[in-house]
Each structure stands twice: as C-alpha cells, then as structure tokens.
Amino acid sequence: MQITLLKGKLHMACVTQAELWYDGSCAIDADLVKLAGLREFEQIDIYNVDNGERFSTYVILAEPGSKTISMNGAAARKVQVGDRIIIAAYAGMEEAEADRHKPKLVYLNSDNSVNRTSNTIPVQVA
C-alpha cells in the first residue's frame, strides 16, 4: 500500500515578489530548491502563515543565491510581499520505504538565508 509523506519543505520562507502577470508558479532560489530536495516543475503546497491561505502550485527556478521566493500568476493574489510561508512537497511510497524515509527540512531566516536544516521534527510537548 502506498502512503504519502512529507518529502521536503522550506519553513518560514519570506515572499520577495508577487508577479500577477507572470506564468503561474512559485519561483524559488535554485540553491534552496536543491537543499530541500525539490525539483523544477514539481507540485508544491503553500501555507501562508500570515493569512492562513493554503494552495498548490509548482516550482520554477530562480537565480541561485538570490534568495528569491516569488509567487506568480493567480498565486500572487494569495500573498503579500513579506508574508512568511511554508513550501511543502510530498511523495508517495510503499510502507517499507516510508519506514526509512527522512524528509529534507530547511528552516529559513526572514531574509531567506538558511537558519538550519534537519530531517526530523521534535515531538510536540503538551
């Protein structure tokens, strides 16, 4: 049986651009794409921490080292420049593979520089 698990995420990315008339997508600094284990044209989910919006789009590459996070097309209506977002990708896998799976988690500062990386999320304490 296949299950769907978190593959990789960019946590607390800061939107640097919103381009309504650009082809729909999310342009992400190519270095960050690689670090989070994402791929060009891969479907991603966006969770806007500032306004609660949740939507799907796909990855396009922005210039490496630019720290760009640009929401394009219709997705530009769901964010404001400066909003903090979570960008997540998921993958389907067999349960045996899921037992060994480690997601690529990238935690960002407000300027989209890398704060830290991990492959685990601590247990939430009550």
Swiss-Prot record:
It catalyses: L-aspartate + H(+) = beta-alanine + CO2. The modification Pyruvic acid (Ser) is found at residue 25. One of its GO terms (molecular function) is aspartate 1-decarboxylase activity. InterPro entries: Asp_de-COase-like_dom_sf (IPR009010), Asp_decarbox (IPR003190). Its main location: cytoplasm. Belongs to the PanD family. It comes from the Bacteria. Its EC number is 4.1.1.11. This is Aspartate 1-decarboxylase. Substrate binds at residues 57, 73-75. Heterooctamer of four alpha and four beta subunits. It is found in: Cytoplasm. Its cofactor is pyruvate. The gene is panD. Keywords: Autocatalytic cleavage, Cytoplasm, Decarboxylase, Lyase, Pantothenate biosynthesis, Pyruvate, Schiff base, Zymogen. The lineage of its organism: Bacteria, Pseudomonadati, Pseudomonadota, Gammaproteobacteria, Cellvibrionales. One of its GO terms (cellular component) is cytosol. The active site is at residues 25, 58. Is synthesized initially as an inactive proenzyme, which is activated by self-cleavage at a specific serine bond to produce a beta-subunit with a hydroxyl group at its C-terminus and an alpha-subunit with a pyruvoyl group at its N-terminus. Binds 1 pyruvoyl group covalently per subunit. CDD domains: Asp_decarbox. Catalyzes the pyruvoyl-dependent decarboxylation of aspartate to produce beta-alanine.
